[in-house]
């Protein structure tokens, strides 16, 4: 009788056991601190969908919304939602659960399937700001590949997220979070995780001789390792000095693919028809001859960066000193409020609209303090026009102008290494 009871229990539990033990499972490690309010972008994209998306041709396509229109002279965008969708908790997807926090935008629910976004000023490209996945707290998604099965917190910090596939045959996914990259590496070595990503080539190469490990290398076009230049700091106001920095910068082919400008080649508005600055010390020295002859050039340029880019910063420092500049390098653990040169990673928005980063009125986000009439006009026109072909022309001109003005030097799109079990 007891044997029959055990068999009966196993039969009843088999679906659950199959889910946890028999299905393929991928355990991904991530370094960093995340909460229920700001989970990693990779997780968000797996567990939910946005109202709209922008295709490779720059056209806006519906996802959770089926249509939209403008009212109030373009100051109100009314979105109509699909009425046959459900959250991952099996509850009906309606407008009242949609939470967007957008500057200068008032969100108003009209009915279960209609929502208004009221702007202070008309903005024809507004829908592009609705491409983020819609999430209902905590971590409930809609129309997605995966659902959050469970999660674990420690002092409100995410430690583990378990994802269950919404389609048969897909692997289970588990995300484990670690405070530092060192903790992440140790977790892989101890078998706690099956894969993790890193930008550190030396770290990736340390696993080459591991027989049970495979290393994949890809280019992360969503990031640009960039040298930002304070265009209002001493001799850096002189465009020739900024160009000299570009000409004196080495290639970093071992670290990534050279960047051409502020847009990645994956953007529908990208152009490589821009000025290029290949390493040319003689050209840099000639450009610096007049600026360096002035008394104001005696001060050192402060180059700030973070630990992850210390090696790159050291190479830049050596090259800049070779052409006559004085450089003071400092490794920081915080974002500086003032700098001459700042080397860091930058993630451009998916749409070519970069108004917040380069327009002269954007004091909080235009960290280079660029004040250029042509750039301002191009950025304003790009937000005013909805026609994709016209916008493409505007942003090609924008890229050319930014590269000519050199408020930043765009070094490379980094290689990302995925270390995973075979």
Each model region followed by its residue ranges:
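Aromatic- and charge-enriched surface segment that lines or borders ligand/interaction sites
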Residues: 67-106, 187
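Extracytoplasmic/peripheral linker and loop segments enriched in polar/acidic and small residues
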Residues: 328-333, 356-421
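Ligand/substrate-recognition segments at binding pockets and active sites
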Residues: 3-7, 289-348
């Amino acid at each position: 009788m007891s044997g029959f009871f055990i068999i009966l229990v196993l039969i009843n539990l088999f679906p659950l056991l199959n889910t946890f033990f028999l299905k393929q499972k991928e355990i991904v490690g991530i370094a960093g601190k995340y909460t229920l309010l700001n989970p990693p972008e990779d997780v968000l994209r797996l567990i939910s969908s946005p109202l709209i998306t922008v295709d490779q041709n720059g056209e806006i396509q519906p996802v959770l919304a089926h249509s939209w229109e403008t009212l109030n002279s373009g100051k109100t965008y009314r979105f109509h939602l699909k009425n046959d969708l459900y959250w991952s908790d099996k509850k009906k997807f309606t407008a009242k659960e949609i939470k967007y926090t957008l500057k200068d935008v008032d969100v108003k629910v009209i009915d279960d399937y209609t929502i208004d976004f009221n702007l202070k000023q008309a903005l024809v490209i507004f829908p592009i700001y609705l491409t983020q996945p819609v999430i209902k707290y905590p971590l409930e998604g809609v129309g997605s590949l995966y659902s959050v099965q469970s999660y674990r917190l420690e002092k409100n910090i995410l430690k583990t997220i378990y994802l269950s596939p919404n389609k048969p045959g897909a692997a289970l996914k588990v995300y484990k979070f670690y405070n530092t990259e060192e903790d992440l590496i140790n977790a892989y070595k101890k078998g706690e995780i099956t894969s993790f990503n890193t930008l550190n080539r030396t770290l990736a190469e340390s696993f080459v001789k591991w027989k049970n490990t495979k290393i994949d290398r890809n280019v992360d076009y969503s990031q640009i390792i960039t040298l930002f230049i304070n265009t209002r700091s001493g001799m850096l106001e002189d465009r020739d000095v900024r160009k000299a920095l570009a000409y004196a910068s080495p290639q970093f082919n071992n670290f990534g693919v050279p960047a051409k400008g502020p847009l990645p080649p994956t953007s529908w508005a990208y152009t490589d028809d821009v000025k290029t600055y290949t390493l040319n010390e003689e050209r840099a020295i000639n450009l610096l001859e007049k600026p360096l002859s002035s008394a104001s050039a005696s001060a050192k340029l402060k180059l700030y960066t973070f630990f992850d880019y210390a090696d790159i910063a050291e190479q830049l420092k050596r090259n800049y000193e070779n052409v006559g500049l004085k450089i003071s390098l400092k490794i920081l653990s915080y974002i500086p409020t003032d700098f001459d040169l700042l080397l860091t990673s930058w993630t451009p928005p998916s749409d070519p609209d970069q108004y917040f980063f380069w327009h002269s009125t954007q004091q909080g986000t235009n960290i280079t303090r660029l004040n250029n009439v042509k750039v301002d006009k191009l950025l304003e026109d790009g937000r005013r026009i909805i026609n994709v072909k016209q916008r493409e022309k505007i942003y090609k001109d924008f890229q050319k102008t930014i590269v000519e003005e050199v408020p930043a030097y765009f070094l490379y799109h980094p290689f990302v290494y995925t270390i995973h079990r075979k």
